[in-house]
């Protein structure tokens, strides 16, 4: 499935690596949803809950689920232009939810890089077609992607609560939680999100997850804080591409042993 949202820290390029490490489960929870790369790359679970504290995210996916044709029409009639990009930043919660969702897509797809903290990174355009060619193509293909995304969201619960509230509610052994919080600020170059997390916030999150009965996988960059608080957890690393930082090493911590398959051993022989 193609991405419907460009979002900082999205996992589209490494979603396959993460999905391969998801154990069998009954209920799926993703409390820091963002663009939902892992969710859209895996098979549906019996029960699924997606959540994000940034109200633009759940508003977008509710609009896609509830009336994809309406949102697709708004996007289809929104030109790829500097004026639309600048205007979209004036969007607010008093506006129609569907127009607000379209404005959110505009700021994320038509800008250089992607931020959700209100910072304007500049309208993406190019004289030689190096960037504008694929940027324009992606924008004008977006209505079709919206319609495809809607089908996957049909039976999904969508919430807009602090992550810890949701995590505590889903504290059951047959639940799998994929935790992809804003990474520790010391491991990246700049603030990117509307709702960032301090080191104290990360400590509180890890404290709750350590005591959870659910199966948990956490994504992050190499971190002494995470290593010290998650002693005894299974840890794996693989290469990923950061937005501006080139190649980075992605780390996942799991409170369960990974279930290897024949495919894993076949891939190992290739290297």
Predicted regions and their residues:
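Class I S-adenosyl-L-methionine
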Residues: 1-49, 53, 164-176, 183-271
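SAM cofactor-binding core of SAM-dependent methyltransferases
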Residues: 20, 24-92
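Generic alpha-helical structural signal
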Residues: 62, 143, 203-206
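Low-complexity, flexible helical/coil segments
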Residues: 65-69, 83-90, 139-144, 212-218, ...
